[in-house]
Amino acid sequence: MDLNGETSTKRKRSSVAAPAERPAKHLKPGNSTLTPGDATPANGTVYNVEDEEDTGRVMPIGPAQADSPEWQATIEKVVKSVVSIHFCQTCSFDTDLSMSSQATGFVVDAERGYILTNRHVVCAGPFWGYCIFDNHEECDVHPVYRDPVHDFGILKFNPKAIRYMELTELKLRPEAARVGCEIRVVGNDAGEKLSILSGVISRLDRNAPEYGDGYCDFNTNYIQAAAAASGGSSGSPVVNIDGHAIALQAGGRADGAATDYFLPLDRPLRALECIRRGEPVTRGTIQTQWILKPFDECRRLGLTPEWEAAVRKASPHETSMLVAEIILPEGPADGKLEEGDVLLQVNGELLTQFIRLDDILDSSVGKTVRLLVQRGGQNVEVECEVGDLHAITPDRFVTVAGGTFHNLSYQQARLYAIAARGVYVCEAAGSFKLENTLSGWIIDAVDKRPTRNLDEFIEVMKTIPDRARVVISYRHIRDLHTRGTSIVYIDRHWHPKMRMAIRNDETGLWDFSDLADPVPAETPVPRKADFIQLDGVSQPAVADIVRSFVRVSCTMPLKLDGYPQAKKTGFGLVIDAGKGLVVVSRAIVPYDLCDINITVADSIIVVAKVIFMHPLQNYTIIQYDPSLVQAPVQSAELSTEYIKQGQETIFVGFNQNFRIVVAKTAVTDITTVSIPANASAPRYRAINLDAITVDTGLSGQCTNGVLIGEDGVVQALWLNYLGERTPNSHKDVEYHLGFATPALLPVTSKIQQGIIPKLRILNMESYVVQMSQARIMGVSEEWIQKVAQANPSRHQLFMVRKVDCPPPQFTSNADSLQEGDIILTLDGQLITRVSELDKMYEKEVLDALIVRNGQEIHLKLPTVPTEDLETDRAVVFCGAVLQKPHHAVRQQISKLHSEVYVSARSRGSPAYQYGLAPTNFITAVNGVSTPNLDSFVREVSMIPDNTYFRLRAVTFDNVPWVVTMKKNDHYFPMSEYVKDPSQPLGWRTVSHERDRHKDGITPDAANLNPDAMDEVYEEVSDVEPEVD
């Protein structure tokens, strides 16, 4: 891509199939293609790790000419050493988000089982993966080394696991890389087809490419060649005609030019030899970035003719020198070197190459080196103590209150030229979800105490009680000029454990340990507050209604029911101040596995719980403890009369700044609607309700509010309704509509009496038909006249749009509605208004008269108990959230294939890697039928860790397929959430460890972060940023 005249480079990525017109949920992975609309390829990869946000295309390779016999013989030997690497980074760490991907590597020690690949493949954080050899044998791999700076890492495999081919290794010959040398890049295209691309080395002295905000290599030269390597080629060997590896594929141009960049193998060869000898791979640093600059630029920086002549005489082929680009504050060179210094000598040795500089620094850790530089034509000699590069590269992280933290890395510090210290938020989730940004925050202080490093942060967090609200001070690494201050709610009940993870290079795993139990929450105390007074508002009723509003914040620790967010805030209306009852939109409180906090008078914060959720009409009733609120809260008076079209009313709402706004207006329309279904993944939506619209622009700006009369009586609630996700922008649509209060009264009156209604509903969705349509469909003139008399304002009947999938208790011979039926009467009453359908709420069977295919038919329609439709259990397995199909699924599907429904999945998990997608149904495990969650848990509990198993699944559109998956209990242990009213949170958590049940497992132990979970197929943006 050409950006203002500049070209950009990128790491190679697998091509992604074009999105299909049909919703992605209707598709299943095939054998070798990506699933359209999803980031999960069919073969179990998600996106190539070299992906980046630039949309520039790699130049397609034309038909290759036949290679010479020498090259053919070489390639035949080389391909046996090349492997396809499939891997996950199981959680976000440093510059990388959690992900599943693939790349290439090659065997460099067949006896010990070492594979060389890129550092961005080996990952800075927790790695889990396997490799596939040329003969399609597979074995597990784990990292033994990842370089802190340079783009290479070493994986280890068990050579004895390869039984059907003789292992061969490639010799590393970095000295064989020369300008004009003919090369072949031998890699894997999406892990399926061997890709052999030819090229010629054109440069040996290119500076390392910049990859934007992600991981970047530096302090090394790169080799440039014309090859245009394809997706999945990251980590491929660059070989010469002798069959020796002379470089490592790393990156390329994103503007379509057939140019690639390779890492020289000098430092990988040294690291491999150290590992073979069992020695540590020492890495030294003075925390300075150097770049190569040609002599003409060096002269402008002050290089004298005498020194230029000396350099050219000592190295006749050199055309550039090393120049200081970035000196990190508080580093060994801070105050000694300056940007623009031209490096002349190190320890008295004339030096112009990165390789020799690395040699000296890596062998001088803990020692002092002398550097001679030229600064503005003057010789300057300094001494710097060489630090340990591994010491400023994080190898541990801590999770607490839903967030993940580690010390700021040298990578990030170099990128933004800041000191390599501080607490870095690599996964901003849970209590630490700051400003809706996933990562990049530096925490300066918590609870007014400084947190200069991870150890200080841990000690502070150990002392903070559950449910405490503390002040934190933070900055974003991209904007260090702005210091933010926020109050965070510390969640140590859904996330009770503070866990430390430490990298273990012997096993390749990250070892977890618990640091501290949570400090119990403090007992809440009553607090006083006064409501604001509205100045300049002429209606007294508006001034009073302010005392009936509270702010509602809902946080979900786990994604269920297809709901797309982990936190939602809005406003609710107090309907009984004495009992603490509040009605709020169900788009704000979608299910009861959540934390609800209510703010009264912008001052008092109290906890609330879910009392009732309406299955169709988009409202939830919650309850707080009124004894904790010493404020003049007023119960809103709800109208018993339905508001009418054209009637004047007062609109009172809250805008996006949570400020109250008022407008006198009129009702423009009252229409029977159903909120559109979300095509990509079913989720709760309101159906069969009369929606009110008003004649004011404020109605579209306000998510919550009320319509009130001059007497202060609430005529309608103003609610936000969650709608569909747009296919192009992938944003969720919200509708803002009024809901008449008389429809609330039957439910609220019972709750005020201490009775929780257990509603029953007809399992169908309807829409309005006018009399012209009804007559054509067979409704008689007699009934048309009756409709006109029964409802003079709206001559309408209701037609069945969709019949929900019937529950298991329905018998096959029971009467049922069908799509296209027109409902005339229920229990003898003509149905012309939505409110007249409410009679179904308390009836097990309804006598119905319908018109079907032009004939009037009498039916005995059974109703469905709504408590069976709400989610009361969830199983988290291999990163997938499994639950019984919720109501929205039943509304949109005609047949339930099982009661094991995939609701969401975590990025970087086995479910993500192997393509088990949301909206799939699991019907069998290893050939054993699993019709429900009990049978599923029983079968998967018998599967050993790190073992493959088969899942038979069915897509939402009834297409069966089989997925093979490998179990991972270390990073993704199975856990379960079960609704339990006896528990303080209303839910209990259970762990399943080798047939043992253990209460108290938490999302922390199950490696869950709802913000890193997908509830739908979607096109995920590339993890790698643009490259300049």
Curated annotation (Swiss-Prot):
It is found in: Nucleus. One of its GO terms (cellular component) is nucleus. Gene3D superfamilies: 2.30.42.10, 2.40.10.120. Residues 1012-1028 have a biased composition (Acidic residues). This is Pro-apoptotic serine protease nma111. One of its GO terms (biological process) is apoptotic process. Residues 991-1001 have a biased composition (Basic and acidic residues). Residues 289-374, 876-957 form the PDZ domain. InterPro entries: PDZ (IPR001478), PDZ-like_dom (IPR025926), PDZ_6 (IPR041489), PDZ_sf (IPR036034), Peptidase_S1_PA (IPR009003), Peptidase_S1C (IPR001940). Nuclear serine protease which mediates apoptosis. Disulfide bonds: none annotated. Residues 82-266 are annotated as: Serine protease. GO terms for molecular function: serine-type endopeptidase activity. It comes from the Eukaryota. The active site is at H120 (charge relay system), D151 (charge relay system), S233 (charge relay system). It holds the Pfam family PDZ_1. Its EC number is 3.4.21.-. Residues 1-46, 991-1028 are annotated as: Disordered. The keyword Ubl conjugation does not apply. Keywords: Apoptosis, Hydrolase, Nucleus, Protease, Repeat, Serine protease. The keyword Lyase does not apply. Belongs to the peptidase S1C family.
